[in-house]
A protein has these predicted regions:
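Catalytic phosphate/metal-binding cores of nucleic-acid and nucleotide-processing enzymes, i.e., regions
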Residues: 1-103
C-alpha cells in the first residue's frame, strides 16, 4: 500500500497530537513467526501518563504482507482518531512498558 500525500500529512499531524497528549505509539516489525504490529494508546484523561484506562488501537501485519512502519502507524492512528478503539486498564500498558514491549 502506498500512502498519498494527504495520508502522509495526516499521519504526521496525528502522531504529533498523540505524543503531545501523553499517548504512546509503538511499531514492532515481524520477528520470526510473529506478526508485526502498531499500537496506539491514548490516556482517557488528557495528558495523563498514569491514567487508569487507555483508548487503544492496533494495526496488524498478516503473514504474507510486507509490514511498512508508516502504513501501520497510519492505520492505527486512523482507527484511534475515528474512535475504533478498545479500552485497556493503565496497568496493562505499564506492564508492557516494563517488559520493553513498547517504547
Amino acid at each position: 500500500m502506498k500512502m498519498t500525500k494527504d495520508q502522509k500529512t495526516c499521519r504526521k499531524l496525528w502522531l504529533e497530537h498523540v505524543r503531545e497528549s501523553g499517548g504512546i505509539v509503538h511499531t514492532r516489525p515481524p520477528i520470526g513467526d510473529e506478526n508485526g504490529f502498531c499500537l496506539v494508546a491514548m490516556p482517557c484523561a488528557y495528558n495523563s501518563r498514569h491514567a487508569k484506562f487507555y483508548d487503544v488501537s492496533f494495526a496488524w501485519c498478516a503473514d504474507n504482507d510486507v509490514f511498512d512502519r508508516k502504513v501501520g502507524e497510519f492505520i492505527a492512528l486512523d482507527r484511534q482518531m475515528f474512535g475504533q478503539t478498545t479500552k485497556l486498564p493503565g496497568y496493562i500498558i505499564d506492564n508492557m512498558l516494563e517488559m520493553d514491549l513498547v517504547d
